[in-house]
Amino acid sequence: MRYIKFFKELNNKNVNLVGGKNASIGEMFQELVPIGIKVPDGFAITSEAYWYLLEQGGAKQKIIELLENVDATEIDVLKIRSKQIRELIFGTPFPSDLRDEIFQAYEILSQQYHMKEADVAVRSSATAEDLPDASFAGQQDTYLNIKGKTELIHYIKSCLASLFTDRAISYRASRGFDHLKVALSVGVQKMVRADKGSAGVMFSIDTETGFKDAVFITSAWGLGENVVGGTINPDEFYVFKPTLEQNKRPIIKRQLGNKTQKMVYAPRGSEHPTRNIKTTKKEWQSFSLSDEDVLILAKYAIEIEKHYSKEAKQYRPMDIEWAKDGESGEIFIVQARPETVQSQKTKEENQVFEKFKFKNPNEKKEIILQGRAIGSKIGSGKVRIINDLEHMNSFKEGEILVTDNTDPDWEPCMKKASAVITNRGGRTCHAAIVAREIGVPAIVGVSGATDSLYTGMEITVSCAEGEEGYVYAGIYEHEIERVELSNMQETQTKIYINIGNPEKAFSFSQLPNHGVGLARMEMIILNQIKAHPLALVDLHHKKSVKEKNEIENLMAGYANPKDFFVKKIAEGIGMISAAFYPKPVIVRTSDFKSNEYMRMLGGSSYEPNEENPMLGYRGASRYYSESYNEAFSWECEALALVREEMGLTNMKVMIPFLRTIEEGKKVLEILRKNNLESGKNGLEIYIMCELPVNVILADDFLSLFDGFSIGSNDLTQLTLGVDRDSELVSHVFDERNEAMLKMFKKAIEACKRHNKYCGICGQAPSDYPEVTEFLVKEGITSISLNPDSVIPTWNAVAKLEKELKDHGLTAR
């Protein structure tokens, strides 16, 4: 056949003939199907067929005339011309020989699947599409559940006409592509019955930070167009590549999306071949993929990335669409293309750490809305609410675009925006992809944004605070901090990072560092669990109906309270451990005080009213108590899961507020019973050296544990007898006090005597350079800092160590 190529005949060398999408499907069919990756079969109608059609009746010349002198920024003119061109293509009849070839290929495909008329997807594939430096994805149309020759011909024509939508013309103009040098091929691919299963998008790289060692997967019930189009908020998963390849099960994040609707087949004879129906409560409260499915997809992503990188002779992260057949249970890859944002950063750009931050971070700001952050920038301006494309011409440069959901035709408008906010969508929808590519901060999945905001309202959009994006009332000034990482000198003293928010882990791992000196368990409990641990242990007792319902809503997607608690904690710790792997990550077990626990959901039923909670029921004393022991065992199970199931053996454990040697023995026994034993698979167990008794009896504590991490905050409070929360005596609280320096010195010396680890993770080194200098000279193993202190402290330590070396001195 002259104008038809079956997928098995194609590979990536055929881009000019069948476009990037079809060439890539052919490549996978030839190279990846043999190693077990499933790809639905089909055929491509070549770009030669496109030119053949345009030669009929002089259509090509008419298109040239209609595009002459069109300014892509003149939205009204662009809309008129693009509509005229599409109508022209629709009105041009298929030559009979081309139509006959299409029908013959369709018959062969139907017979292959033992069907009279196969249900197929009809997809556009532009000859300049899916190249590493351009994201044509979604600019031309895709049609699902097409069945029969009449429908097939109609939707192939629809695909060809979609080469001239407003956005497609605008994009080509902005990238310097000649409109008549970009052709369109059409792919016809057997449908996967995802209408009875699930579908989505995955990337072999983190789309926000460029972290290379994670596969990011989005998923929803039904056909995948809702995920791609951003009309629902999908489930999200992260899988860590290095330990997955060691046959571990490193699902380091699961996030349940609301998935309010799903796309299914429409009855034959309907106006459209697919339709959306509401999901059931069970569906939106359940993950649309099992853990096994997530791991299969991640393995597919790794193999696809390896193949395309090998072929390109350079690292090539991939953007992949997948579908799970609800009838057979099989998972298929339906498209794969190079990722177009993170992969395009130059080596020089990757050597610069760029951080957007508010000029006055302590200024009080009113959060009015929040959703999923896209990118890491900040934008501010006046709101412009646009509910449909007809009003796009009212949008002014620098305004903030607020709409229900952006589809590919919105790009001319998005390019003018200082930020974008949508009611719906996830991190892999077209709006998110385009926002990343043009460098505009966007927040998607902001329920009710178009109702809560109004045109002309002044707001600030921040995507610089982690995975969650915030909309603030008013305009707040921001600045950009840029640091050249290539100039950083190595240090002998290890520089670690303190981290409490797993969502920032991938970003913070790009700072110069030797690992994590303090990962705060309690921050994960506070932000992910939200309920008192004992309220979960004891879910069916002592609960009001309201409280019980709130807790059950938090647990949606998980089998039971224990499954929820253990997996959520493991995911948070796993995310941090993966981000810094294989560098050490020291996790401090939970260290809430009773008044802090009391404020959590259900907490008032379990906590005493203490006069001085700072010195009360906290730390190790809580772990072995009869009332809290089971909750701590769950915590231990989560830590063991990170090391054993996820394979993240770089994670170490640290016990806070340990008062006596006897307490130490009790806690170690609980850890041992929960598969956390010092020395097993390289595990080290430290304690926070934050009580004077830890220093006074350092030799005894170090005979039980593998090292100290000095907690300068509590150690200063308890050595100087100062309530660190009291303003009346705050002037006395000073880690530079001579007594404190002696405490630090004694702790370091004790660790050296026992040849054990000694670090510091309190606030002192972040605040006082002279304390850092003292610790370096005393020979401390590591200094763990708040992220904003890492670079200046690193440079100061490198300079100090060089000066010591130049004078023939070394740390003690």
UniProtKB/Swiss-Prot annotation:
It comes from the Bacteria. Pfam families: PEP-utilizers, PEP-utilizers_C, PPDK_N. Substrate binds at residues 520, 588, 690, 711-714. GO terms for molecular function: ATP binding; metal ion binding; pyruvate, water dikinase activity. The active site is at 430 (tele-phosphohistidine intermediate), 761 (proton donor). PROSITE patterns: PEP_ENZYMES_2, PEP_ENZYMES_PHOS_SITE. The keyword Disulfide bond does not apply. Its cofactor is Mg(2+). Mg(2+) binds at residues 690, 714. It catalyses: pyruvate + ATP + H2O = phosphoenolpyruvate + AMP + phosphate + 2 H(+). GO terms for biological process: gluconeogenesis. It is an enzyme of class 2 (transferase). Pathway: Carbohydrate biosynthesis; gluconeogenesis. The N-terminal domain contains the ATP/Pi binding site, the central domain the pyrophosphate/phosphate carrier histidine, and the C-terminal domain the pyruvate binding site. Catalyzes the phosphorylation of pyruvate to phosphoenolpyruvate. Belongs to the PEP-utilizing enzyme family. The reaction takes place in three steps, mediated by a phosphocarrier histidine residue located on the surface of the central domain. The two first partial reactions are catalyzed at an active site located on the N-terminal domain, and the third partial reaction is catalyzed at an active site located on the C-terminal domain. For catalytic turnover, the central domain swivels from the concave surface of the N-terminal domain to that of the C-terminal domain. This is Phosphoenolpyruvate synthase.
